[in-house]
From Swiss-Prot:
Keywords, alphabetical: Developmental protein, DNA-binding, Homeobox, Nucleus, Transcription, Transcription regulation
SUPFAM superfamilies per record: Homeodomain-like
GO biological process: maternal-to-zygotic transition of gene expression
Protein family (similarity comment): Belongs to the paired homeobox family. Obox subfamily.
A Pfam entry, by short name: Homeodomain
UniProt biased composition (Polar residues): 61-72
Organism: Mus musculus (Mouse)
Location of the DNA-binding region in this protein: 94-153
Name recorded for this polypeptide: Oocyte-specific homeobox protein 3
Main location: nucleus
Length: 335
């Protein structure tokens, strides 16, 4: 009997007991199971039988798994698989090489493609024989060329759309205000204002301007003052208003309204820039006007009926705008 490990004398006997008992106990399954359960209280009968049955199977599996590895390790590798990548990348499908056509072949195929983009089977066979490729390669070439043609056509359409949009926008902007007139300075030819001159931008006449306009119209109908009527006609024909009848603001406003019909815009604007000083200094003051009216009344015999007065002559004089008064224009009679 083999001796156990060198331990304390008291522990040596206890350590040798299981060895002697295990050698003397008969190989009875039931008794052996009870003995194992006594040694290991956590063991159950089912687990013990399973462990006993699984031991030979494990040994067989280990031998089978170790056998091929040992043999494969001894087998030499073939020259076919030397210097080649192994693993998942080796399972990729081999990519077919692309067919390269010469210039003569491409010209021939393009000529037939311009005639018909979808050739029939007979035409495909003829092209394959003339070019020297298979029918499948001819079909692939026509398919790729059709896709290329569609892309080029779509790109040309997209490039043409912005040009048409810009041209239509420019036409709409130019025709949006057909009656607009650009204002240009007559001296240097530069534009005086960037906006357009339409109906909404024409200034309206005030009360004094309307009354003076009615006075001119009355003279035109009655033919009673030839000099002023002649000046009024010259104003309509040439776009120049009498200096004695208007101030700077009135001439500019009325002239801007009539220039659209009878005169050019630069003439009216140039006159409006030159007229203020002459028009402001030409009119008499308020005291002079009242003095003249009183003198006319004193010289008349019957100032209520005004029967002995000569043919009335209507004139318009501009009063000083800085002094407050109710009437801006006064029509008076002169003997």
């Amino acid at each position: 009997m083999a001796e156990g490990p060198s331990l304390h004398p008291k522990l040596q006997v206890a350590s040798n007991i299981p060895i002697e008992l295990s050698s003397q106990i008969p190989q009875d399954p039931a008794r052996n199971l009870a003995f194992q359960m006594c040694q290991n209280p956590l063991m159950t009968p089912g687990s013990t039988m399973q462990s006993r049955l699984s031991v030979p199977e494990r040994n067989l599996l280990q031998q089978e798994s170790q056998g091929p590895t040992r043999q494969s390790g001894r087998m030499p590798l073939s020259d076919r698989y030397v210097n080649k990548q192994t693993g998942p990348m080796a399972l990729r499908k081999f990519r077919k090489e692309r067919t390269v056509y010469s210039k003569e072949q491409q010209c021939l195929l393009q000529k037939h493609f311009d005639e018909f983009q979808y050739p029939n089977e007979k035409k495909i066979v003829e092209l394959a024989l003339s070019v020297g490729v298979t029918k499948r390669e001819i079909k692939i070439w026509f398919k790729n060329n059709r896709a290329k043609y569609r892309r080029m056509k779509l790109q040309n359409i997209k490039q043409a759309l912005p040009e048409t949009n810009e041209s239509s926008k420019a036409v709409s902007e130019s025709t949006h205000f057909p009656g607009s007139i650009p204002v240009v300075d007559s001296d240097n030819g530069e534009s005086m204002c960037s906006g357009t001159f339409g109906e909404d931008s024409i200034p309206k006449l005030n009360c004094s301007q309307e009354s003076s306009l009615h006075c001119f119209q009355a003279c035109d109908g009655d033919m009673c003052c030839p000099q002023e009527y002649q000046e009024y006609q010259e104003y309509l024909l040439h776009g120049h208003a009498p200096v004695t009848a208007w101030n700077s603001g009135q001439s500019a406003a009325f002239e801007s309204q009539t220039d659209l019909a009878v005169a050019e815009v630069p003439v009216g604007l140039a006159y409006a820039a030159q007229a203020p000083e002459d028009a402001h200094n030409s009119g008499p003051c308020e005291d002079e006007l009242w003095q003249r009216i009183l003198e006319d009344l004193d010289t008349s015999d019957d100032w209520l009926t005004l029967r002995n007065l000569s043919t009335p002559v209507y004139t318009t004089e501009v009063l000083d705008q800085s002094k407050p008064y109710s009437h801006e224009e006064v029509c008076y009679t002169h003997l």
